[in-house]
UniProtKB/Swiss-Prot annotation:
SMART domains: PA2c. Belongs to the phospholipase A2 family. Group I subfamily. D49 sub-subfamily. This is Acidic phospholipase A2 2. Binds 1 Ca(2+) ion. The keyword Lipoprotein does not apply. The active site is at residues 75, 121. Residues 20-27 form a propeptide. GO terms for molecular function: calcium ion binding; calcium-dependent phospholipase A2 activity; phospholipid binding; signaling receptor binding. GO terms for biological process: arachidonate secretion; fatty acid biosynthetic process; lipid catabolic process; phospholipid metabolic process; positive regulation of fibroblast proliferation. It comes from Bungarus flaviceps flaviceps (Red-headed krait).
Amino acid sequence: MNPAHLLVLSAVCVSLLGAAIVPPQPLNLIQFSSLIQCANGGSRATWHYADYGCYCGKGGGGTPVDELDRCCQTHDNCYGEAEKLTKCSPYYKTYKYDCSEGKLTCNDAPGSCERSVCDCDRVAAICFAGAPYNDKNFMINTETNCQ
């Protein structure tokens, strides 16, 4: 075998091995982002909510800093309830929904994991759209501000 071909083949194999150990990314974050954009009419990019206050983004704790942060706390708690359903992983569960003129509708069967997760995201998206956004609460130091 040609050494150049062997080198390319080795690189591909190593790449595939590396990809096999990369954990899957939460699929429904894309859907949640779409629901947020539907509810707020695209007025604020969804990444603004990824690291806001004490609860928006990964994890959460302490006292919410404002109304928007309370929306995130409620969303976290809602996902916690959804996780109690059999085989329900909210961060990886996708669902069916419609967005029409800012109105969000979840279309999966009531009581299903998919519907529960969609309802969590729908309520949060509507809450985000109605809550004031305070720039000073974006990327705060959670260790000192979230007691």
